[in-house]
């Protein structure tokens, strides 16, 4: 027997959540594997990316329509709908707001559960490839110029806000 296996998408409740895991970034020029710690409280996101040996590569914060990328003292600010201007990513419009809902298994505005494990928005294609009891565990976000793969190691769901801390 062969065929497709349907994944049941269990959405993470809105509010305060975080996860830790691995992020694979692939472009035509490079391939990197980073550790990721993503903290979300309502509309505020804080993402810490670390490279080999746990060295912090970047902190990304999205709050009130602004995206702030801190790469070890080099801080760049974007409006949420701005295109990225970093080397290698010129003109690339990343769906930051939508992504914070998609990784939880929700539609773009967070109100409804995704009806499929796949979402297409512009040139971006998001897919949940594995789910667990706590929520999505493996996901991909693809664009003709870049492919991101996310593997969640641990979800933490909370009803109350807590400061960013190590999982």
Model-derived regions: residue spans:
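An acidic-aromatic
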Residues: 43-94
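Post-signal-peptide N-terminal segment of Sec-exported extracytoplasmic proteins
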Residues: 16-59
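Residue-level detector of beta-strand face positions
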Residues: 24, 48, 66-68, 118, ...
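Beta-strand-dominated lipid-handling architectures at cellular/organellar boundaries
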Residues: 16-20, 39-41, 59-61, 66-68, ...
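Bacterial Sec signal peptide processing site at the extreme N-terminus
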Residues: 2-20
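Residue-level marker for the onset of beta-strands and adjacent loop->beta junctions
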Residues: 32-34, 43, 56, 65, ...
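Mature, soluble, non-transmembrane domains
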Residues: 6, 78-167
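Glycine-centered tight beta-turn/hairpin loop motif at sheet-sheet or coil-to-beta transitions
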Residues: 29-31, 53, 73, 121-123, ...
């Amino acid at each position: 027997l062969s065929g497709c296996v349907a994944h049941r998408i269990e959405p993470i409740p809105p509010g305060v959540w975080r996860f830790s895991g691995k992020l694979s970034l692939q472009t035509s020029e490079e391939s990197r594997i980073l550790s990721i710690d993503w903290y979300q409280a309502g509309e505020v996101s804080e993402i810490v990316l670390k490279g080999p040996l746990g060295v912090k590569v970047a902190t990304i914060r999205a709050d009130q329509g602004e995206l702030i990328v801190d790469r070890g003292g080099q801080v760049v600010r974007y409006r949420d709908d701005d295109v990225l201007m970093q080397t290698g990513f010129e003109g690339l419009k990343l769906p930051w707001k939508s992504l914070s809902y998609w990784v939880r298994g929700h539609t773009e505005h967070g109100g409804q559960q995704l009806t499929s494990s796949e979402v297409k928005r512009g040139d971006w294609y998001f897919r949940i490839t594995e789910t667990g009891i706590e929520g999505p565990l493996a996901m991909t976000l693809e664009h003709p110029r870049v492919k991101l793969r996310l593997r969640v190691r641990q979800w933490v769901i909370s009803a109350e806000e807590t400061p960013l801390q190590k999982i």
